[in-house]
């Protein structure tokens, strides 16, 4: 019913808009240096009380002016104010172009998005949703005062995953086709050249994409859009990296129509905030523009950011208590006196983008982009033949001992001997060097005998390499002075290469590529243990592929269109899109457990989806606005959710279908010289989603896949923000988010394992209705104050609060089969079913800066200190533990533990920048 009523109503509103003419004053505000449109510039008609603000294209409209001459005052943070006379005639003329000049002395104060505070460790965590919000942030009052303050708690705007916030780099959608997540490490460290961005909020229209329900962000990397400058900076921090050097040079648009920008950086830390972590990252960037006449412009952008990072892991509260710190990390240990981390992430996925802008007339623009990207991403981890060597393995914890005396003794050992809380690299080498074994007919060759020390422990590298190319084109046409239409087309070709290699044999001679549990689970089958039956008795050495090897083939295409119109007191838009999503798996190994269903191409899946969107904004006056927007559509499942055990077989999740998305939002906007505010209510429903996740079944010693079918959830809430400037020097900010994100269905659960076709759970009903959506605080608040001094310095203090961060929960415990043996309302019954949540959290943050002008040079100092009170009890992630090894787990209270991650205590970032 919603979509049936929406389109006729909006079409009736659009009809008179196409050719309506009124006495108004229209204009566009641009940057003098780059000629880029400026967003949210305050435009005041002196003596009348009328106020307007520029939109995302730099345009503003002042209506119902009496004919005559007026004085316009234009002001924007970081620019010199402009006062200029204008004539308001009876008939509208073409838009008047106004140019604002940057105030270089206050640059450090006015940088709209302080990317320098972005933490690389957070950028890849939990899907990166909270960082997606950071890059998505715009001049919108809610985002500018709230998103940065709440990023400490991994806040996700409206509870959405990052796939709902698509990110466009020079016209290219860079969200990962496999998962929908944007991996921001692909361009980390390039802050200086990624400042020029345009964002849409929620369901509002975008000129560059149809966007998703969270909005969209476009970053402009064209050299001609960059400020002409030479810029060098050094930063000192105690977060994921300690040091950062950056250098940027940009020519601006030169005679002959050329422009060039070069940028590079290096970030490093031998020890990150958490023990055992480290970071090494180098970034590079080249952008070249060629402008041909007034109508044609070409751009070539090349960038990359190779990085290597030793990572931390979540663990049990029991281990945090034994270690005496909330920053205990089980991933590392000493080797020959040096710290060594077993879990290291490496990534380098450079991208090349070719962009063409064509302006054949005043009313028509075309932007076309083609791109290619290729690279590798790898995560190392320990692989082993025997028992789990992790120091926080739950069988080794005091709580695993039934005898209280033994439990107390184990607790004393772990508490007082740090080496027992670390990986024992020395023992790995000793064991590997003393395990001689002979492999007959090695690698499938009769008579090929290999003798040597067979590895019991190795470091493996789980690779996720990829190749990608595509194009995106957007045509914009002004239908009249008050209406415009956009038409877009895009296509994406993607091949993901998933396999693992031997990274380090740890002193052994070889690793035997065989499933150690296959003969146990599938007895009597020839070659069942071989991961590739074409190479039985496969002996592998360093850098050789083993275990699994498959490709993800994805082909996506789409068309969209949108019409926007601006009446004197009403703005309306309507749009729609259609998409085709195709994908399939290609196995590169013939697995011994699935010899007929692992090698070659799987079934080719194809999904046709659509989306419709519309909305209106009613202008009460120049300062007060009401708006309402709606969306209805379908979305294809992601590749990650489509296969039962993608590492080893081609089997597809049965009855896989697109899911539905319905979303509405409405609210109030306040824009005045001293007050900016937004109050928004939103309601979004996701229906019939499929969710899949890979995990390790500790009780069986194998990897498995958990699949949920028929997942429904509802995200509802209120966003509010207010920014007040009682004087030119003072700014007071307040914001709040009150959300209610919960599941509304009882989906079916399938749990498979990688070494047998028999499911562990086959279509069990999961009673998760009314459980809360995890991984984000649903209640947040912020209060901030900022002072800007006359001698170009500023300081701000922000208090933030977060609550209702619910832990992710084990679906198998929410099935009838699991709880049937438990007494209702008993402690085990509640421990099995009740969803846990983190305690409420509070933080106090400081940010300040100072700038100096020395002849024609500028020096900027910025200081950011988060968590001034050193609150080390902020839980930012929690989940039910899957490490069940107790005989009677359902009744045994020791089984019901959570694995947690704590946010940083006091942490800082200090940067010094020189600019010419």
Indicate where each model-derived feature is located.
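Short acidic/polar hinge/loop motifs at secondary-structure boundaries
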Residues: 134, 143, 172-203, 220-222, ...
């Amino acid at each position: 019913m919603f979509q049936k009523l929406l389109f006729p109503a909006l079409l009736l509103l659009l009809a008179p808009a196409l050719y309506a003419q009124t006495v108004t004053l229209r204009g566009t505000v641009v940057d003098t240096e780059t000629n880029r449109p400026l967003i949210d510039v305050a435009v005041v008609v002196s003596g009348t009380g009328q106020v307007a603000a520029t939109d995302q294209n730099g345009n503003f409209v002042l209506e119902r002016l009496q004919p005559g001459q007026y004085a316009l005052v234009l002001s924007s943070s970081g620019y010199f104010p402009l006062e200029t006379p204008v004539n308001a005639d009876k008939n509208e003329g073409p838009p008047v172009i106004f140019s604002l000049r940057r105030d270089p002395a206050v640059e450090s104060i006015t940088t709209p998005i302080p990317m320098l505070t972005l933490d690389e460790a957070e950028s890849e965590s939990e899907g990166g949703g909270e960082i997606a919000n950071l890059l998505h942030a715009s001049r919108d009052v809610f985002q500018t005062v709230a998103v940065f303050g709440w990023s400490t708690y991994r806040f996700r705007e409206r509870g959405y995953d990052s796939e709902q916030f698509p990110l466009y780099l020079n016209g290219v959608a860079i969200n990962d086709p496999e998962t929908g997540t944007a991996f921001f490490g692909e361009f980390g460290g390039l802050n200086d050249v990624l400042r020029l961005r345009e964002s849409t909020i929620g369901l509002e229209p975008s000129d560059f994409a149809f966007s998703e329900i969270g909005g969209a962000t476009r970053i402009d990397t064209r050299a001609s859009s960059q400020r002409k400058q030479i810029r060098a900076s050094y930063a000192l921090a105690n977060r994921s990296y300690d040091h950062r050097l950056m250098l940027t040079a940009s020519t601006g648009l030169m005679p002959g129509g050329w422009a060039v920008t070069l940028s590079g950086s290096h970030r490093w830390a031998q020890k990150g905030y958490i023990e055992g972590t480290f970071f090494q990252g180098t970034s590079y960037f080249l952008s070249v523009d060629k402008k041909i006449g007034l109508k044609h412009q070409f751009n070539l952008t090349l960038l990359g950011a190779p990085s290597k990072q030793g990572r931390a892991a979540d663990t049990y509260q029991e281990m945090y208590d034994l270690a005496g710190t909330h920053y205990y990390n089980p991933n590392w240990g000493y080797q020959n006196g040096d710290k060594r981390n077993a879990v290291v992430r490496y990534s380098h996925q450079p991208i090349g983008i070719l962009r063409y802008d064509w302006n054949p007339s005043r009313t028509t623009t075309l932007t076309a982009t083609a791109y290619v990207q290729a690279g590798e991403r790898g995560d190392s981890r320990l692989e082993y033949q025997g028992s789990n060597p992790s120091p926080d393995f739950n069988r080794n914890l005091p709580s695993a001992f039934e005898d209280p005396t033994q439990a107390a003794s184990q607790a004393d050992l772990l508490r007082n001997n740090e080496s027992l809380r670390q990986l024992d690299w020395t023992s790995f080498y000793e064991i590997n060097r003393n395990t001689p074994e002979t492999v007959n007919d090695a690698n499938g060759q009769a008579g090929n005998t290999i003798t040597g020390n067979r590895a019991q422990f190795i470091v493996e590298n789980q690779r996720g390499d990829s190749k990608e190319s595509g194009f995106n084109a957007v045509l914009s046409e002004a239908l009249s002075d008050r209406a415009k239409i956009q038409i877009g087309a895009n296509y994406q070709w993607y091949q993901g290469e998933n396999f693992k290699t031997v990274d380090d044999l740890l002193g052994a001679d070889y690793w035997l590529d065989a499933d150690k549990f296959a003969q146990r689970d599938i007895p009597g089958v020839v070659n069942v243990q071989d991961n590739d039956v074409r190479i039985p008795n496969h002996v592998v050495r360093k850098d050789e592929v083993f275990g699994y090897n498959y490709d993800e083939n994805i082909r996506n295409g789409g068309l969209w269109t949108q019409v926007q119109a601006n009446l004197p007191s009403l703005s309306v838009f309507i749009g729609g899109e259609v998409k085709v999503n195709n994908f399939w798996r290609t196995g590169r190994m013939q697995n011994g457990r699935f010899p007929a269903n692992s090698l070659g191409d799987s079934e080719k899946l194809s999904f046709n989806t659509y989306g419709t969107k519309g909305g209106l904004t009613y202008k009460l006056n120049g300062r007060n606005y009401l708006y309402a927007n709606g969306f209805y559509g379908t979305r294809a499942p992601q590749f990650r959710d489509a296969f039962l055990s993608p590492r080893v077989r081609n089997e597809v999740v049965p009855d896989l279908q697109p899911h539905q998305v319905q979303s509405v939002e409405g609210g109030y906007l306040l824009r005045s010289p001293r007050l900016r505010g937004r109050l928004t209510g939103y309601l979004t429903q996701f229906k019939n989603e499929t969710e899949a996740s890979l995990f390790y079944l500790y009780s069986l010693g194998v990897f498995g896949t958990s699949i949920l079918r028929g997942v429904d959830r509802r995200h509802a809430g209120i966003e509010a923000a207010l920014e007040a400037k009682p004087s030119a020097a003072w700014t007071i900010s307040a914001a709040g988010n009150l959300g209610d994100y919960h599941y509304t269905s009882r989906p079916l659960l399938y749990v498979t394992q990688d070494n047998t076709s028999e499911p562990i759970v086959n279509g069990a009903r999961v009673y998760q209705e009314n459980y809360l959506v995890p991984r984000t605080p649903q209640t947040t608040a912020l209060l901030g104050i900022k002072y800007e001094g006359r001698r170009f310095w500023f300081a701000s203090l922000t208090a933030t609060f977060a609550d209702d961060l619910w832990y992710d929960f084990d679906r198998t415990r929410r099935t009838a089969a699991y709880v049937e043996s438990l007494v209702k309302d008993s402690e085990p019954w509640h421990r099995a079913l009740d969803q846990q949540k983190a305690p409420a959290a509070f933080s106090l943050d400081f940010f300040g800066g100072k700038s100096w002008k020395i002849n024609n040079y500028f020096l900027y100092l910025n200081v950011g200190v988060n968590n001034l009170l050193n609150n080390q009890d902020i839980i930012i992630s929690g989940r039910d533990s899957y490490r069940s090894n107790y005989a009677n787990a359902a009744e045994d209270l020791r089984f019901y533990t959570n694995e947690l991650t704590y946010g940083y205590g006091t942490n800082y970032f200090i940067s010094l920048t020189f600019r010419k």
